[in-house]
Amino acid sequence: VTSQLFHAIPAQLNSNASRYQVSSVIEDSRVERLQEQIAILKDSMTTNIAYHANDPSAGLAQHISTEQFKLFCADTGLFVTLAFWDEGFTSNTIYQKLLSDKLRADIGYVYENIVAQILTASGRKLYYHTWPTEKGNRNYEVDFILSREGKICPIEVKSSQSKEHVSIDA
């Protein structure tokens, strides 16, 4: 079960869901029943967990939802290997195309994983925030939220030339 949760990290991030959806990885499962496996992943230091901050204000840790989280790989090279697992082995061609921005795939989730790895390596806890749009048919999301000197600092990760940041403007 722990292995299934780990191997699904790239697919879960690529799905653009507002959280890691355990039930789509392990049928009929809920986060509450898999707390031990999630703790194993966290303690193994192969994953980084970003918790949903229900109230994006100073003291983020006081306002988290332990049932709403995103999992990231602690090592982006390992993340890329998992994302392209169907290759038999992740060829150097994939890495070369990735590094030269010529990989024909939506790889925004790879950049999110890179930012998660950098923030964690710098000693930061990971938090993100979502809230419904005015119409309520989808959610806005701020990819990462930091608390610095009593102020909230949103981080929006972009993988393209797009300069729009709808979530931050909302």
Question: Would you name each region that the model predicts?
Answer:
Residues 83-86, 156-157, 166-167:
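Short conserved micro-motifs at the rims of enzyme active sites and ligand-binding pockets
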Residues 1-151:
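Accessory nucleic acid-recognition modules appended to NTPase machines
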Residues 128, 137, 161-169:
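Active-site-adjacent loop/helix micro-motif of nuclease/hydrolase catalytic cores
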Residues 147-162:
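Active-site ExK catalytic segment of metal-dependent nucleases
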